[in-house]
Amino acid sequence: MNRRGNSMGKPMTAMLQMQAVHRDESQVVELKKTSYFPYLFNLVMPKMFYHSPNRIVVARLYLDVHTHDKQAAEYFEGFQTPCFEVPASLFPGEVPLDKIVFMPTVMLPMGFEAGGVFGPGVLPPSSYPVDLIASGHKGETPPLFVGLRCLYVHLPLEIESLLDKMGEFPASQNALVYKLHPSDHLLQKENPQELMLRPDFTLSMIYNIPAPPPPPSPYPYRHVPVQYNIYTPDLSKVLMLMPHQRNLTVAILSTVNNPHVPSVALATMGDEECPKFELPSDVFPICEGVNRPIFLPRRFLPKGFESGCVFKPGSLSELWFVNYIGRFATPQPQHTCAITPPLFVGKYCRGEGAISMFKEIQLESKKQNCNVDQSLAEGSLKAVEPKRAHVPLTKGFFVMETEHPTPPEGAHCLQSYQQASDEGCLVKVKKDEDAEITESQEKDKVYPTKVASKSENEKKYLSCFKVDSDIELVADATADMGPAEMSLLVKEKDLPGINGACVLSQLSQVLVDRDQIRSHTDQLIHNHIYRMDRDRMLALRQPIHMCSGCGTLH
């Protein structure tokens, strides 16, 4: 017999194991009325036990975790439950083997064909396994589970990965597991309210298909602080493990595996349709404001769901989780355990067929293995380089007509509008001829001038600003032109989904705002210089004279 102690405390399953005894498949016993009948389906043994030749296990139970299920005890009373002969060598002293309560298969841990429990205080301290109880233990002995494992155990893939990574979440994510801490008076309720026991609800478990590891990067990843003002995950690639097909299902989400996606939040706030349904008022509280449930667009829902909503972390109280999730909760890694985890409530399509979860996982694993093999076969230094888009990047952005052959600062010369179009220029700016003619006519009335020749007026030069040019330089060049008109160089049909008039209006407003800021700054500087000169002349007791030529003090 192999013995294994519990050096890590309550979270690990303290157990003893030994070789199995012979059991006939027809060996059953009638379940009588009992005072301790826990639901042990969520009790998971260490992985080494499932691959060990030892098939009998003895595990200590905890009353605050493995509580008595009164409804299940009344329901299964009189049922035929599988049993086996418990070896007396498991216990150090004489033990009342006839007081073990064998349980039905649905109440046993995963992978067991038979098993039973000794209630609290049933075993005397001298008969309790030494490695499963402290030497100075006082009071009644804790309950004990004795089970017989199946000969061949096929655990679900998510349980296998959970056993592999138990306590080994990445440190960079600071993943924690949120656990409920129910009080005694809540656990001793005569009428439990768990959704798992209701005919119109089912409690599901979220399974995330493992994502391929990201390629190595020479740049350190910046830590993004976690915010819970809004929480809208993308659940389109998760699998929903539902024990029963019901109209509504509830599942606890993980802030680590199901993070907030900003694009989903934008979709919920836009024009995209988000199918809604009425949440049962007897189950879910009325949450308003930032705590209200967010309904997701259908393309972000799990497969087979017609509508669904998400409660962000901390929006539901811990008392709600204790009352309605209770002992059926599945632990999920979270960034913080200080607040309650997020919750998904979905409405399942009645017409949709159930998705083969294991087939889906198998296909995804084969796909990832093929990608890995292909990457290894084509591995080279060039393969590590990031792939660049084949779409040509635009160089130009802003082209203007000027009368000077020298381009403004930050711009370069072009020969024609065709060249500007080839470089990707979108906006064309030229002098407003109507405003220029009106202004020249007003000046001619006061100061008659010689009219320029037609050839001189037609001589224009094109200057182009790149798409990454300094907006201050663009604003300066536009202001130096005086009155100007702005238009698109390309046709609006060549810019699908873009409102050309709105783009020109916004760009014009930006340039006007820049010009106003520059004018205001210049005025402040001139006022400051004037005050400094005036104070200097007053200090020197000199008369203050304003120069008629330059407008400054001399």
From Swiss-Prot:
Name recorded for this polypeptide: DM7 family protein GG17593
Domain of life (superkingdom): Eukaryota
UniProt xrefs under SMART domains: DM7 (SM00688)
Family: Belongs to the DM7 family.
The entry's keywords: Repeat
InterPro entries: DM7 (IPR006610)
